[in-house]
């Protein structure tokens, strides 16, 4: 919400699609006293021409919750998995190229099967070895040469070839 509020949703250059529970989003907006217009999208037929850059474009994923802000637990794993799968299907459709994920509990979602979401998305999109992370704010953008690695393994991955490949991907 903070990013949306700071950028003033009415001035977005590109539309944003949120994939989450409509009811949860509304309850969280009420709690934070935010007001944004929401446009519900049909997840079966999403095309760029249907998107509105003056509203939150929302793909609704059902989630039963008690409190709008609660600790992440195992019960949210299925919900997160469905949201991620919807996002991956949008990317695989070829209509969308960019995916920005919010905070996801690696402990509950990945359950130590992978080091991070970057590697998870790379595996699901058959692009292992070509994954990059971009960390940015309004003043700075950084893209680490490696993704989630133990410190002792990082030095082996920082080579001229890997740096060039990384820059080409970005």
Locate each region found by the language model.
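Anion-binding alpha/beta catalytic cores of soluble intermediary-metabolism enzymes, centered on
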Residues: 1-170
């Amino acid at each position: 919400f903070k990013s949306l509020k700071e950028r003033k949703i009415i001035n977005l250059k590109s539309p944003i699609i949120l994939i989450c529970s409509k009811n949860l989003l509304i309850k969280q907006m009420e709690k934070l006293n935010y007001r944004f217009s929401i446009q519900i999208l049909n997840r079966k037929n999403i095309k760029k021409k249907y998107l509105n850059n003056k509203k939150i474009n929302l793909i609704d994923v059902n989630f039963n919750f008690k409190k709008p802000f609660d600790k992440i637990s195992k019960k949210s794993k299925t919900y997160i998995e469905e949201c991620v799968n919807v996002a991956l299907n949008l990317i695989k459709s070829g209509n969308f190229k960019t995916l920005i994920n919010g905070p996801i509990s690696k402990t509950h979602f990945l359950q130590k099967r992978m080091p991070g979401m970057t590697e998870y998305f790379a595996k699901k999109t058959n692009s292992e070895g070509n994954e990059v992370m971009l960390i940015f704010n309004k003043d700075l953008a950084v893209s680490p040469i490696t993704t989630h690695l133990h410190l002792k393994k990082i030095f082996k991955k920082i080579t001229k070839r890997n740096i060039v490949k990384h820059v080409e991907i970005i």
